[in-house]
Design a protein with these regions (language model features):
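Receiver (REC) domain active-site loop signature in two-component systems and cognate sites
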Residues: 55-57
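Non-catalytic signal-transmission and effector/linker regions of two-component phosphorelay proteins
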Residues: 1-2
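Acidic catalytic/metal-coordinating carboxylates
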Residues: 35-38, 59-64
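Short amphipathic alpha-helix used as the core "switch/output" element in two-component signaling
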Residues: 41, 63-74
């Protein structure tokens, strides 16, 4: 399962990636991003199966990112 982690707090983002990599060899963290704009690029490039997304982030929050992803057909 391809997983993208989108979280503005670096310790949380890195912790999630670390935990997911240890839980199961079937989990493949395909990338992480620190805001919604970077997250959109990650989604377009990697097309993950699961998105772990923070809702409150600076610049573009998680809800705005989801709306934009839907508008782009991602």
């Amino acid at each position: 399962m391809k997983i993208a982690v989108i979280e503005d707090e670096k310790p949380i983002r890195e912790g999630l990636v670390h935990i997911l990599n240890k839980i199961s060899p079937e989990y493949q963290v395909v990338g992480s991003a620190e805001n919604g704009a970077e997250g959109l690029i990650l989604l377009e490039e990697e097309m993950p199966d699961l998105i772990m997304l923070d809702i409150q982030m600076p610049d573009m929050d998680g809800l705005q990112m989801l709306k934009e992803a839907r508008a782009r057909g991602i």
